[in-house]
């Protein structure tokens, strides 16, 4: 499948150049709408008991995964049947839309810009668009840390993991991954509403991100060495703090980022009005500053490029073997 490899490379390039233009309807919105619709229906069908909500959550995962993989696979098959060029163009389009490299940079740089303008309310609003925590009372340091943390975490589940699944199975597998990831972001909360209903989605997200998160961490360590950051500290903090999170995956790249930047990340945060106790990640060698958002993005970009080279190289090796 030489076209799949070419589509991955071209799509990655388009993502870096164009990001997510507003004139293009993003397929992930369709997935999000489907999840919301199915949740509403399943909550009516299954009893409002812990076991009933668990069962409803399992059915949500099954239905969304079937649609997330099956619909793109059928559309791609039909496109190639009509004409190989149409199939290739659709594959390129989806390989462009599935990763979120430039989008992550653009959204986090909005936070940076507001901080440089000394507009703390604006920075709080900008960071609220990319994090799940409450941001209304965050200090400048809190806003900066939140932005750096989301760049670090999304380097794995927004960039490297999508590239990995695209390389393994093309857009259909990429959309399957994004479906699981989107379910987790919508229903994978440990609050009263989603504790049982969202459990299956959250656990599945942990499973599918287990390997990508660790690949992302080591790629980021390599990228920090290429960027002449403190890669030895990045490796040290990674080995020490990579499990300092409720999720087995979220602290993997956060630990590398904290070590490379020589700052302390994570710690307590407020979600839905309640303080959630979290361990810190990294050592407080120096205070976090707005410029760390730019540094984090440089590291994220280089990590994404190394990921593309690594995954495309492996695919090419087996393709031409």
Where do the PLM segments sit?
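Hydrophobic alpha-helical transmembrane segments
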Residues: 1-176, 180, 188-321
